[in-house]
Amino acid sequence: MAKINTLWSFFTKDGNIDNFDILNKIHKLDSLNYFEFIKEISINDYNLIFEGTEYDWKTLAVYTKYWIEAQKRIKINEGTFAFFKTHNARVKLKENHYTNELTTLGFIYISRDPRDIVLSYSKHTNKDIDSTIDLLINDTIMGKDKTKNRTLEVLLNWKDHYRSWKKFIKVPSLFLKYEDLVNDIEREINNITDFFYSNFNIEISNKNEKIKNVIKSTNFDNLKNMENKNGFDEKSKYSDFFRSGKTKQWKNELNQNQKNLIEQSCKNQMIELGYM
């Protein structure tokens, strides 16, 4: 999320951010609010999605019918576009795609070394590392408990999540690595601005000055201070959201068996992305 702040800070006047208000303007594509219309179509489907206390595969089968229609109904001024965020894989279930070229103009995908994801998510959820590895390498549905106005998130496993978006070639895309954003933020910011300009004719005014401000205001220490001062909606009850902001911590915190499990499951995609 620190890296998403880097992106959105470009859409402030000068590239500076001193709170998380701008993130609150970026809605989750999986917000329950976007599915209220189901009540007009099928009260049974509506009740299944909205009234239960937990989601299951039966609910998922119903929910997928409305993915594209929900996105079509999002109110965006004609001739403009909006930004959304999601953790979902671009899955196809019962002939229903999570999204398509009619509702998505383009996307930016940020990958991260799965060995570091395990550590980060383990802290975030207070699950042990072995259980978290199981989530990472096996097909997973997140958000089963109805919290924070969120529907199900279909993550699949790490490698298939990546592949699901990689295969979506009908719209412009930019694939970034968390590690590159940490190690060479200026280069990656330029890649992002080039992506917006070449595909959507969005030109950033005062680009060089903004880059300096973006780098300064979205550095990890500043984001952590903002979280400590103002809180952060996506912080878990178990740990700070902006916890360390480092890479390759897995080298010291995973045992050899844990490393092997992840690497054997995700080998081809890890090689493709330069993690192995």
Where are these predicted regions, by residue range?
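Short acidic (Asp/Glu) and glycine-rich catalytic loops that position anionic groups and cofactors
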Residues: 170-172, 189-194, 239-245
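PAPS/PAP-binding and catalytic site of the sulfotransferase fold
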Residues: 1-10, 175-202, 214, 222
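Short, charged, surface-exposed loops that flank catalytic or proteolytic processing sites
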Residues: 133, 203-207
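Hydrophobic alpha-helical segments
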Residues: 199, 217, 268-272
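PAPS-dependent sulfotransferase catalytic core
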Residues: 209-264
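Secondary-structure transition/capping residues
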Residues: 129, 203, 222-225, 273
